Amino acid sequence: MIGGEWINQLLGPAVVALAYPLYIHRSLLVKLAVPLFAGAAAGAFVGVASGLSMAKWAGFGPEILYAISAKSVTTPVAVVITESFGGITSLAAVMVMIAGIGGAILHTYIFRIFGIHSHLGRGMGMGSASHAIGTAELMKDSQLEGSISTVAMVASAVIAVSYTHLTLPTILRV
């Protein structure tokens, strides 16, 4: 296989691996649609706002701000967000990896410190903040939490795209 073809070969099984638990838990996920959407909206807001706050506090320029603001969504979405504003896409990819790996490593401690024990809270937190890497980590222990995390990851990405395109131009003019 040449270049990234092996990744494309593994993408199909990876999608099925995430989709099967969604199918199994579909009735509960439908019942939780409103809290899932609200949690994803909050997660997307916190993800973008925390990235912007850190970058502005550090005095970074707009190109870096755009990249850091997209840290809590999946890499393809982060690259599109960053690219659409003229940011540094490779930095966006690195920030996404840091957020994902950080969440996958630290989630147990964070959940314990903040007393997060519900499947909904754990899934929403990981899907919104640590995207696919965090979702895969949760899936090891609980298909339900992994399913919630998958929905949160997708919804947060859609909301983050909308949020960044509606707010970043205004925020950076100030």
Segments and roles (model prediction):
Residues 64-91, 97-98, 117-155:
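Alpha-helical membrane segments and immediately flanking helix-loop junctions
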